[in-house]
Amino acid sequence: MKATTGGLAGLAAFTALALACNPDKGPVGLIPPTFDRLSEASSAPLVQHIVAPQATDPAIDQALDNHYAWLDTTGRTNHKLFVFMPGTGLTPAVYQLVQQEAARVGYHVIGLMYPNRPGLAKVCPSDPDPAACYENSRLEIIDGIDRSPWVDVNAANSIDNRLTKLLQYLARQYPDEGWDRFLAHDKPKWSQMAVSGHSQGGGHAAMIAKIRLVARVVMFSSVTDSLQGASVPWVATHVTPSDRYYGFDHDLDEQFRSIRASWDSLGMAAFGPAVAPENSAPPYDFTHMLVTDYHPLRGPGRPAHSSSCTDFNTPLAADGTPVFLDAWRYFLTTRSSDEDDTDDETSSASAARRDP
């Protein structure tokens, strides 16, 4: 265990908090959402755990880069777990800034390593049934049931098992930190989790929310699955309500057309048009879609596609804080009208009945 400040020198002030009290800014016909500024977020060092996947389960033998776990033991908690999944070929280590911010606003946080090669956007277009390829490959990566010739993920290496075994490990090693609250009968308590990820990882977050009721879905530069720019069928139906989905991308992302089509298919446009965060301020008229054209940092990979949240491409202010800090915090803390704060067996049992 070690503590880290993560290089965040401070938190940007929100200049439009008063908008959160204006019901005219909410979606027409719905109870307006609320925006929790959390202006007293802790500046204390975060607790960080770096865990090798195979240390949690010796049967895990793929994608062995470290998991990351974070929490702020001095600040207030929202009793939710934020699970972040990296994009193709990347690891939780290159997304530490957004993970740290989630911890600072009250989440327990896991950056989850999982088998994320090959890139589905590379292989599925050549499949005889691309739509089925995207869906079946994602499901296999999540639960380890053999469905796709393009990926080779068994139950031990699946997202489900990795998350379960990591939570069990953290609960055993650090019993006073509260990781066990996110397990029920040795399974993840999905109703108490915000699932998130970048690119391929954001698509897995959306797939998890399709088949299970989750507290929130935050998609960075995702979902990229498409059929000639149109959204694939699996995106259109989902157990998690549309008002719990949020998306962030760069308008120069070469996959932006596909990503925006997926947001429309998820029903996110019902909550207002996309907003450029650099030209606005929270709560961004309560939109569920943020699209930037802010110049990304140069670095490896595709800077526009990665600028939404990777440490090496997301732009930084003069004081070293991420330019998109307010946007991240908005997605992490704004509340939908039906969001459930309960943390009891009734809630988890209801969610479990929805799980496959």
Segments (PLM) and residue ranges:
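Short beta-strand element of the alpha/beta-hydrolase
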Residues: 79-87
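Gly/Ala-rich beta-loop-alpha elbow adjacent to hydrolase catalytic centers
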Residues: 196-201, 205
